[in-house]
Amino acid sequence: PAWVCNKMNNALDADWFRGLGAGESAGQFTVELPQGWQTVETPVQFPVCKDRTPAWVQYVQSRRLEVTCGEAPFLASRYDAATGEMIPVARRIGILDRKLRVVSENAATEDEWRKYATHAVQSTYGYEYQGDNLLLARVNLLLTYAEHLQARWQRKPTKEELQPIANIISWNLWQMDGLHRSVPGGKPQPEAEQLDLFSMFGAAEPQPPTVSCKVKNWRKGSHGTAQNFETIQEGSTSMKFDYVIGNPPYQ
């Protein structure tokens, strides 16, 4: 349900804002209600970061991943996945929705909006095993971008504007077997064999290599750099994402 996604996304944001030393009044997108929420209509408050990238830009660029994402209800809340009921843009609580709300509240011009809205999409990731679910997730993210642009600037995006966004989404939402971190079927399963006295001491047959998934690291190169999922990291750490979320017990 969307109210569960809101509650869990709120927990991520509360942790993120605490990391900046922000007060309790900062970072409030919604007020939680029993099986629901009320949108905070005033602009989201961010702490002042002296001699650093503005806090709102850091938030927009924070990497977040939804695992086994299905239709991506944690990333984009165009509708309540439990009921199918559409959610107005102003009430949406998905990770990308929150990033785009922050961009709309802080970007002074349309060019600035498109720049940081692109950063928002670039830092929003998800993977899914089932191809049909993955298609729905990609469509949801693309329409989320389009609907936020229309809500802010009272116009629909052009095909030329949507093309690079669609390309980013096609990289950032990918098909993967999360248990083996490979493309579906990319890790061959050993066949059951009948053991005998002689084969027990023979050399094991070599297994074909696992077929890894490639994901774009948009912070490397002017158009991003394709890397194996396992090798994406930030600096000298092995951390790929600031936050990982998904249906319990994956959060």
Regions inferred by a protein language model and the residue ranges of each:
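SAM-dependent methyltransferase catalytic region
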Residues: 1-251
